[in-house]
């Protein structure tokens, strides 16, 4: 069995990183010794289900978090470094050079376009250069979908492990009776993820239907956050803003939803990928309204569990909402989706791939 350091790119606890959590539980259950190294608001040692989490304060000059995480990684006598996302990939250059220990890089996101969206062209260009250099030096790359797997495959060995939800965290629950239909969005809120379009469409539909909207997630852009809350107040939408919710606490929120929303905007990186939240909605028996895309359209059609729309058009999104709300088979859609997804799209059916990677490296 191996002593494995899981190195996080961002705060592990808030918002709770459900992919890291699923992976460490999988490794721990297989008998490996796991420690999570993560940026945090303060330096402390915490414990999560028997797993030690070493938290390091983000306070201090630029580069201090990198120094603190690398320092612990070097003195921890670990057998494998499992690095999540971009910054730990950079750290792996140092760790690999000094320890000669195996490194796994887990890439959850399309990092270059994400950096461009959030930080601009220069950050995107630098990210692309670093990925080309650093990813060739790791021992194995893990990622979340086939398109990203093909892109990263030119740099080294790649295994695709989709970020499917776990059955244990999304059990079949008795549906909660609702006084009125409740639309639900779960996840980060950005323009590219459809936050603005979602609110505009909801405003249109609310003029005709007595419905509610629950949002479990947070903003990355303070200007967009201000706009959203101002828009909510101005139009008396009474949105239920829950903020970030722990992954393990989402199931009761899903049980109160009538329709799940996923309105990714028209970008090439989403055409051949399916957002994790869609599988979560399906697993919990919630009909889905989602943006069009080659793979997701096939999924919704086969699962008979919702509707796809042009998510860049608020009016079309609104019409999609109305269509589902008026569909007498809405509840049956949710049942179809749950049955379809529980047989195929759950973490437990893929986690063995992760263990095989570790076994080959130790």
Regions inferred by a protein language model and the residue ranges of each:
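Short hydrophobic beta-strand element within catalytic cores of glycosyltransferases
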Residues: 37, 259-262, 280-290
């Amino acid at each position: 069995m191996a002593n494995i350091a899981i190195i996080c790119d961002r705060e592990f606890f808030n918002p709770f990183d459900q992919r890291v959590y699923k992976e460490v539980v999988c490794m721990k259950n297989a008998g490996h010794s796991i420690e999570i190294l993560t940026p945090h608001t303060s330096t402390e040692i915490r414990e999560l289900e028997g797993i030690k989490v070493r938290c390091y304060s983000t306070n201090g000059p630029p580069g201090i978090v990198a120094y603190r995480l690398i320092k612990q990684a070097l003195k921890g006598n670990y057998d494998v470094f499992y690095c999540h996302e971009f910054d730990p990939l950079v750290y792996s250059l140092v760790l690999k050079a000094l320890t000669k220990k195996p490194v796994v890089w887990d890439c959850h996101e399309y990092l270059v376009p994400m950096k461009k969206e959030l930080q601009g062209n220069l950050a995107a260009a630098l990210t692309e250069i670093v990925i080309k250099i650093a990813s060739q030096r790791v021992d194995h790359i893990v990622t979340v979908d086939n398109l990203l797997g093909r892109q990263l495959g030119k740099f080294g060995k790649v295994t695709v492990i989709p970020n499917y939800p776990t059955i244990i965290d999304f059990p079949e629950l008795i549906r909660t009776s609702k006084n009125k239909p409740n639309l639900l969005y779960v996840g980060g809120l950005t323009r590219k993820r459809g936050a603005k379009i979602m609110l505009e469409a909801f405003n249109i539909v609310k003029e005709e239907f007595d419905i509610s909207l629950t949002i479990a997630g947070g903003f990355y852009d303070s200007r967009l956050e201000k706009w959203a809350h101002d828009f909510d107040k101005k139009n008396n939408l009474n949105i239920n803003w829950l903020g970030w919710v722990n992954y393990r606490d989402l199931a009761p929120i899903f049980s109160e939803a009538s329709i799940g929303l996923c309105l990714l905007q028209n970008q090439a990186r989403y055409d051949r990928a399916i957002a994790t939240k869609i599988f979560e909605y399906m697993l919990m028996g919630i009909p889905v309204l989602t943006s069009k895309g080659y793979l997701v359209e096939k999924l919704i059609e086969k699962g008979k569990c919702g509707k796809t729309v042009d998510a860049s058009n608020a009016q079309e999104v609104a019409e999609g909402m109305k269509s589902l709300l008026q569909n007498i088979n809405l509840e049956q859609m949710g049942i179809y989706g749950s049955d379809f997804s529980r047989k195929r799209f759950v973490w437990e059916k893929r986690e063995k791939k992760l263990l095989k990677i570790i076994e080959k490296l130790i």
